């Protein structure tokens, strides 16, 4: 019977993280803070001690590039997805965000590439990376792997 209770609790916890989806059934980074006060509280804890962050990062108010995905890192589940400053500046200013399913931890990687970079120049060689939320090496790798899934990132 306790296995059944554990399964039910896991389904409720996992389901609540996914329940705040948009009409298309997909969760996007820019919807998280308004979907649940716990997300807002956790994110504010991440950015409050950071200096010189753009407002779109502080408020997660940019343009979502794609839906968020459930990912496991070191046995813990996270909701991970990208956010762009705006649709036309996605290559230049983007944020990869990861929230734990329990909404208690959040990490991010802010990626900036100089605007006006010629098309024949690799963005990876000119990018600067800034990690938020003090992610360990495993989380940094997960955020970087999420970025590398973008076909325009080479």
Question: Residue spans of the language-model regions?
Answer:
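A short, structured loop/turn motif at beta-sheet edges
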Residues: 71-74, 98-104
């Amino acid at each position: 019977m306790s296995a059944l209770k554990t399964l039910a609790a896991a389904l409720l916890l996992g389901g609540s993280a996914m329940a705040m989806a948009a009409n298309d059934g997909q969760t996007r980074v820019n919807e998280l803070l308004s979907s649940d006060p716990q997300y807002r509280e956790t994110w504010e804890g991440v950015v409050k001690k950071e200096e010189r962050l753009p407002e779109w990062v502080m408020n997660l108010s940019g343009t979502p590039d794609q839906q968020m995905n459930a990912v496991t890192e070191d046995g813990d589940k996270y909701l991970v997805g990208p956010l762009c400053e705006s649709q036309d500046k996605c290559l230049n200013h983007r944020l990869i965000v990861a929230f734990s399913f329990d909404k208690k931890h959040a990490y991010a990687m802010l990626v900036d590439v100089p605007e006006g970079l010629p098309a024949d120049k690799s963005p990876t060689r000119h990018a600067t990376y800034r990690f938020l939320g003090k992610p360990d090496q495993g989380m940094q790798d997960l955020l970087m792997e999420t970025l590398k899934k973008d076909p325009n990132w080479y």
